[in-house]
């Protein structure tokens, strides 16, 4: 088992990574008679809720289960209100612990509910998808979507612990696994060239669900995320680099309708557009762009601009991005394999050229 700490002073917390962790009650750091609410979705509940309930029974916790519908289209204020109503109707007090059992949608939504309920209650992240294991469960970003933009309503609120059981990946659909790989590859591009090299060599092992390879990849991603969050919890600086491909990607998700493109799929296509923008700006060379394009293709991810999405469509959504300051668009762009920067003042003509180029890659 790998163990990583997110260092945030009194709000520091552990990330536990490995196979068979759902058999280890100590990782939840709960005590007997504690009240716990597991929030999950209809897909994950039959797969993993019984194991978590068994753990809670072993500890002696009082527990309840809330199942929500599955999908990005349910990451809304309406579903958030369902969680809040459940907590209120059952008269839970501030000592309740909420467990987010599921992928990124569940983690973001439940974390936001925990941040808001009685001004904040403890919650534990138990991510069951690759994307949530390597990215969204770590760092305290919680939110729901709005029709005008993704993750526009939310809070920074850190979990009490993150428990990542790699066995969950054995039930993950291939499309969801590939979507998670987009975020894994992102870490190599923005932060760690040696990890990028390793991913190029180990892609087949990862897709074969090799336990050693998966544990290493997830741990390295969480390590990078923990280092970045410890330096910049609320994204005023270096943490923005974790959004490589997300400005273009969020525009795709919003325009195409939440749930039609998986988040990781949109990030993949967005990463190619960002990399092409970087090349056109002279930040990376053609060979580096081709390596980024090739590894995303190797991971079975979409790399092309959506056919029915114009430059104007992109700009309409991108100008609502949270990195826009004083009306100026800022993009996260690679400056090499393993380094990146937030760049402002990129001419719209260059962005348009990158979007058009990526229609035929």
Curated annotation (Swiss-Prot):
**What is this protein's name?**
3-dehydroquinate synthase
Cystine pairs annotated here are: none
- GO biological process annotations for this chain's record? amino acid biosynthetic process; aromatic amino acid family biosynthetic process; chorismate biosynthetic process
Instruction: Quote the pathway field.
Output: Metabolic intermediate biosynthesis; chorismate biosynthesis; chorismate from D-erythrose 4-phosphate and phosphoenolpyruvate: step 2/7
Free-text function comment from the UniProt entry: Catalyzes the conversion of 3-deoxy-D-arabino-heptulosonate 7-phosphate (DAHP) to dehydroquinate (DHQ).
Q: Could you say which cofactors this protein requires?
A: NAD(+); Co(2+); Zn(2+)
Q: Is the Transmembrane keyword given for this protein?
A: no
Q: Give the source's domain of life in one word.
A: Bacteria
Q: Where in the cell is it found?
A: Cytoplasm
Q: How is the cofactor bound?
A: Binds 1 divalent metal cation per subunit. Can use either Co(2+) or Zn(2+).
Query: What InterPro entries does this protein map onto?
Result: Dehydroquinate_synthase, DHQ_synth_AroB, DHQ_synth_fam, DHQS/DOIS_N, DHQS_C
* Residues the record lists as binding Zn(2+): 183, 246, 263
UniProtKB keywords? Amino-acid biosynthesis, Aromatic amino acid biosynthesis, Cobalt, Cytoplasm, Lyase, Metal-binding, NAD, Nucleotide-binding, Zinc
What EC number(s) does this enzyme carry?
Answer: 4.2.3.4
User: Which reactions fall under this protein's catalytic activity?
Assistant: 7-phospho-2-dehydro-3-deoxy-D-arabino-heptonate = 3-dehydroquinate + phosphate
An annotated GO cellular component: cytoplasm
- Under the GO molecular function aspect, what terms does this record hold? 3-dehydroquinate synthase activity; metal ion binding; nucleotide binding
**Which residues does the annotation say bind NAD(+)?**
41, 70-75, 104-108, 128-129, 141, 150-151, 168-171
Q: Which family does it belong to?
A: Belongs to the sugar phosphate cyclases superfamily. Dehydroquinate synthase family.
């Amino acid at each position: 088992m790998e163990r990583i700490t997110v260092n945030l002073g009194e709000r520091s917390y552990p990330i536990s990574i490995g196979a068979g962790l759902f058999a280890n009650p100590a990782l939840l750091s709960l005590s007997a008679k504690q009240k716990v609410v597991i929030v999950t979705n209809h897909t994950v509940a039959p797969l993993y809720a019984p194991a978590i309930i068994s753990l809670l029974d072993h500890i002696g916790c009082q527990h309840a289960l809330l199942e929500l519908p599955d999908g990005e289209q349910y990451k809304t204020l309406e579903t958030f209100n369902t969680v809040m109503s459940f907590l209120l109707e059952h008269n839970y007090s501030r000592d309740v612990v909420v467990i987010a059992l599921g992928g990124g949608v569940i983690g973001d939504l439940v974390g936001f509910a925990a941040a808001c309920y009685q001004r904040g209650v403890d919650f534990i992240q138990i991510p069951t998808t690759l994307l949530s294991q390597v990215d969204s469960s770590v760092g305290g970003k919680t939110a729901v979507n709005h029709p005008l933009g993704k993750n526009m309503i939310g809070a920074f609120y850190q979990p009490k612990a993150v428990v990542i059981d790699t066995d969950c990946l054995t039930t993950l659909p291939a499309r969801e696994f590939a979507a998670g790989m987009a975020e894994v590859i992102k870490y190599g591009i923005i932060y760690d060239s040696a990890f990028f090299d390793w991913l190029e060599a180990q892609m087949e092992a990862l897709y074969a669900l090799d336990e050693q390879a998966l544990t290493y990849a997830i741990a390295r991603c969480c390590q990078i995320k923990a280092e970045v969050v410890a330096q910049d919890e609320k994204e005023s600086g270096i943490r923005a680099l974790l959004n490589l491909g997300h400005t273009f990607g969020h525009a795709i998700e919003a325009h195409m309708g939440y749930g039609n493109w998986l988040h990781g799929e949109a990030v993949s296509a967005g990463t190619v557009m960002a990399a092409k923008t970087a090349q056109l700006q002279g930040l990376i060379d053609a060979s580096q762009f081709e390596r980024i394009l090739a590894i995303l293709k190797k991971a079975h991810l979409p790399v092309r601009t959506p056919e029915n999405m114009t430059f104007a469509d992109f700009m309409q959504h991108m100008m609502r991005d949270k990195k826009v300051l004083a009306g100026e668009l800022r993009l996260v762009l690679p400056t090499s394999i393993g380094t990146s920067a937030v760049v402002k003042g990129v001419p719209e003509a260059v962005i348009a050229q990158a979007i058009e180029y990526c229609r035929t890659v």
